[in-house]
Amino acid sequence: MMRMGVDLGGTKIELVALSDEGNELFRKRVTTPRDYQGTLTAVVDLVKEAEATLGEKGTVGVGIPGVVSPYSGLVKNANSTWINGQPLDVHLGELLQREVRVANDANCFAVSEAVDGAAAGASVVFGVIIGTGCGAGVAINGKVHGGGNGIGGEWGHNPLPWMTKEEFNTTRCFCGNPDCIETFISGTGFVRDYNAALTAAGTVRAAAKSGADIMLLVDEGDAIAVAAFDRYMDRLARSLAHVINMLDPDAIVLGGGMSNVAAIYPRLPALLAHYVVGRECHTPVVQNLYGCSSGVRGAAWLWEK
């Protein structure tokens, strides 16, 4: 059976068709229209083109930058604001004349890595996307765990665990609350922290624009950059230990731009053990297998094998 996954992003809509074995059969990307009707049309056109090209019909799953309320059936919390308040799965289902499954894009990432990615075979997978923001999702036995409110995995909008005095009221998150995990361990948060330290030290140097800029300085032994990365690692460990203490997943998979920082992985185990209850932690924390394609593949796998 052919499975089609759609990643409905703020700037692009991408469709991937997968075989039963997970082999990619078709891929196409288009610019996201800035209105709801245009978005529906773009998704339907991509599905029809894939089916015409491959000569067969398939299932459709859609990953969105928001969630579907299990009570109203309406999309909420999406940064693509024109889909908020809409029964997206119902409307697409009517247009495509089949059931369409819709899930949060971070949950799709977790499903992708659980089904045939870096955590294949693990029963409970916590998938983390650390880039401009910080999202997460939970997959149990290869299926999305959305939870009773449809917000399972919204870990980035909890307060940073075990905050120091200096960390309290550092930054207000876009969600309206102060000191969210996202404001500290996203790539944006890492850059903000380093640049603040640079200013405080009175060092005459161009501000960093990305985590990669800082890691180049870390490799050179720059003291300010090394200290910023040390703080980042401790905050990441606290944040993930909080998940382990509550959920105790079989594997944690990192995605997003910060997941490409190789220095994270050898340092995490000892730091995690310091914060996990019992001071012992054997949870594997691994880099994703499918990179930026993982979310759209996970949308396809919303229709399980």
Describe the residue ranges of each PLM region:
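ATP-binding/phosphotransfer module of carbohydrate and carboxylate kinases, centering on a glycine-rich
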Residues: 1-59, 69-72, 90-100, 115-122, ...
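Short beta-strand segments
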Residues: 7, 61-65, 103, 126-133, ...
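Hydrophobic "anchor" residues
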Residues: 23-24, 75, 144-145
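Residue-level detector of high-confidence beta-strand sites
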Residues: 27-29, 78, 147
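A charged helix-plus-loop insertion that forms the helical arch/lid used to bind
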Residues: 73-85
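Active-site nucleophile and cofactor-binding loops and adjacent substrate-binding regions
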Residues: 80-81, 101-107, 127-130, 286-293
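Conserved PLP phosphate-binding loop immediately N-terminal to the Schiff-base lysine helix
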Residues: 103-117
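Glycine-rich phosphate-binding loop of actin/hexokinase-like ATP-binding domains
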Residues: 122-184
